[in-house]
Structures are given as C-alpha cells and as structure tokens.
A protein has these predicted regions:
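Helix-loop-helix hairpin linking two adjacent transmembrane segments in secondary transporters
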Residues: 140-185
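Cytoplasmic helix-loop-helix junction between adjacent transmembrane helices
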Residues: 106-145
Length: 403
C-alpha cells in the first residue's frame, strides 16, 4: 500500500494508523463554529482564550515530545497519552459548565494532549520516506488532518445549536485515533529497537551529525520553516477564529453555516493534500509564490464579499492554500535534515507555529486597539503580508542546493 523506505512495506493497518495521528491535529479549531455562542455565554471574559489557550500548552509539549520521542519514550506511548488527554480535556467542558476558569483548565489539558501528538505524524513520515514519496505522504497527512477538521467542525457546529457546551462533545471523534493506535508503527531507531541508519538521497539530505545538533543548512531550514509557520498562524488564525462572527456580520447564516464554511476550508485542504506531491515537484519554490498570492486573493473575498456562496468560496481558497503552504514548508525542511533529526526539527517548527496561534489572540487585540476594529483588519493585514512573502519567494529560492 505505502512504501516503507526501500527496505520494506507497512501493512495497510500500520499505514492507516500512522495517518490517523493527523486526524486530531486540527482539533484546536473544533470550537471555531461556536465562537459567537461562546462569546455570548462569557461576555465579560476574553472568550478568544477558549480557542487560543491550548496553543500555549501545545508549544512546550510539542518541543518536549520531539526531544524524547524514539529516544527515551516510545512514539506509541507518547501518542497514547496524547489522545487520552485530547479526549478528557476536550469533552470535560460539556459537563463542567459553571466556571470559565475551569473551562480554561480543561482547554489547557486538551492543549497538552494535542501537543504531544502534534509533531509525531510528520516526524514518522520523515523517518520512513524520502524524495517524492515523502512529499506525497506529507500531503496525505494533511489530507487526513483536514478530513478530521471537516468532521470535527461540522459536528461541533451542529451540536452548538443545542447549546454552547454541546460543542465539546465533537471531540469524541478522537476515539477513532485511539482505536487505531495499537497498529501504529514504531521507528527502528526507537529507544527500544536497534538503530538503523535510513537511506539518504544524494543532493537532498546531509550527513548525520555526531551529536543531536544540526549543520548550518539544517539550522537555516528549521528557522525558516518555523518563521513561516509562526507568521502563517499569527495572521491567519484570527480569520479562522472569527469566521462565525463574519458570517453573522454579513447576515450570511448562523453557527451551522459557519461550520459549513469551515468544513469547506478543511475539505479544500484535503483536495490539495491528495495532490500535493505532484504539485510540489512540478512547481518547486513557485508553490510558495502561488500559495501566498492565491491565499491573499481568498482573504480578499472574505473581506469584501457579502453573499453566502461567495464567502464560502473565499473560505475554501483559504483552506486550500493553508495546506499548500504548511506542507510546502515541511517538505522543504525535510530536504535539509536527516531522518534521525526529524522528530526534533518538526517539533521546533510545529511548536513555534503553535506559539503563533497563541500570540494571535494578542495580535488581534492589538489590531483592535490600533484600528478600533477586529473583524476585517486581520484580513487586510494578511493580504499585505502574504503579497510581500509571495514577492520575496519570487526572488529567493529556498530549494537551491548550495554546498
């Protein structure tokens, strides 16, 4: 079914279990369709923390998991603890409805669970795959991530119609990942397995270091990936978080319609995820140029359109380009690090990315203070930032192979 380097093959169940790690990776956005209801339920509190607080705990947890995964603790053990905390912290607010503080504690537990698993999927892909197969699998992983996002958000949006706390029952879908965990493959270099050096294609990877450190190009690639993902989360997450408010402002529908828009956001990402390998190896660095320009156009649609159908198209474009840009960043990183460094490199990039998600709440408040408006200003800022990045990557080629 899927190639397991050039030395073996994963069973179908192992392949499915590996990809199932990605299913819950968009879990933080599950409550987005219900943000309007949550804002009404907690008018005197910073309701945005319900969505952004988990990312604060995702950051250190992701870094810790990346440092110990396969070295001191099995990948499977970390994944198990992560999915259990995902379920407990995700579902508990349905029952604990009296205190905003208790709700935030639950979201913190949930964030730790997400963080433990956040980097494992991409790290395992880089452990097992190289070249085009690696790009394909990164794309498939994002396909599953967005597939999970579609279902989590659709279920959450539908449940929100019964009450704000019903939204959190959508996290029960994480049980699918828990059931498949028993088949999750364990890398050969795991702490409990003999060490094997993976095959490294000439021209794409670099010799393994004597220590856990990276060479110069590896450090640059990790820093660039982390910066791009941080910036993407910082400027795009407020738009995703406010999508239900945007639809209400445009009189384009309630929580269910907003959930449909968010599902289109994820569904379009699924489509790109399926074809990512072919797109990336065809366009090379132009993947970034194309992605940033089209994302800016999608944001423009959300900022200026008024009809429900057109807003849906804008949401779909944003989702498509989000996956394209995120996966491109990881694919570029994979060309400059060794398989044994993948868990730490991915953890750093993912952790910094989620730090951008947490900072987005304060970034949104800052925009509100400066402009007096927090719904459309983030859209206009994203358009400007992405246009600048697209222009920069027309000049700078991160894929050039310097010695």
């Amino acid at each position: 079914m899927f190639v397991f380097t050039k030395k073996g093959v994963l069973s179908p169940l192992q392949s499915i279990s590996l990809l199932a790690i990605f299913f819950t990776s968009m879990g933080v956005a599950t409550v987005s369709p219900a943000m309007a209801k949550l804002a009404a339920q907690f008018p005197s509190n910073n309701y945005a923390l319900i969505s952004t607080l988990p990312t604060l705990f995702i950051v250190p947890t992701t870094l810790w998991a990346g440092a110990v995964a396969g070295k001191k603790i099995r990948y499977r053990t970390i994944s198990l603890v992560g999915i259990l905390l995902f379920l407990i912290g995700g579902i508990a607010p349905f029952f604990l409805t009296e205190s905003f503080t208790v709700l935030l504690v639950c979201r913190a537990v949930f964030g730790i669970g997400v963080g433990l698993r956040a980097s494992l999927g991409n790290a395992l892909v880089m452990q097992y795959y190289t070249g085009k197969e690696q790009a394909d699998m990164l794309g498939y992983g994002n396909l599953i991530s967005n597939f999970g996002g579609v279902h989590l958000q659709m279920v959450a949006g539908s449940l929100a119609e019964y009450g704000w706390n019903y939204t959190f029952l959508a996290h029960l879908l994480g049980l699918f990942s828990l059931l498949l965990l028993v088949f999750q493959p364990e890398p050969e270099e795991s702490c409990c397995a003999p060490t094997v050096t993976a095959e490294v294609p000439n021209g794409y990877r670099h010799s393994l270091l004597k220590s856990a450190g990276f060479d110069h190009r590896g450090r640059i690639a990790t820093a660039l990936t982390a910066f791009l993902l941080f910036l993407q989360q910082l400027v795009s997450y407020p738009i995703l978080m406010n999508i239900s408010l945007l639809f209400e402002h445009r009189h384009a529908g309630g929580a269910t319609v907003a959930a449909t828009a968010l599902s289109l956001y994820s569904a379009s990402g699924c489509l790109i995820g399926f074809f990512f390998g072919k797109i990336f190896y065809k366009l090379k660095r132009l993947t970034l140029v194309f992605g940033y320009f089209i994302a800016a156009a999608g944001a423009g649609i959300l900022g200026f359109a008024k009809q429900t159908e057109i807003l849906m198209i804008g949401s779909a474009i944003m989702g498509m380009t989000s996956v394209l840009l995120i996966t491109s960043a990881y694919a570029i990183l994979g060309m400059y690090i060794s398989p044994n460094q993948s868990s730490l490199a991915i953890a750093i990039a993912t952790g910094v990315s989620n730090l951008g998600g947490f900072a987005s709440a304060y970034y949104l408040n800052m925009l509100g203070i400066i402009t007096g408006e927090k719904l459309f200003t983030p859209i206009y800022v994203l358009m400007g930032v992405y246009t600048l990045l697209a222009t920069a990557f027309m000049v700078y080629d991160p894929l050039r192979k310097n010695s």
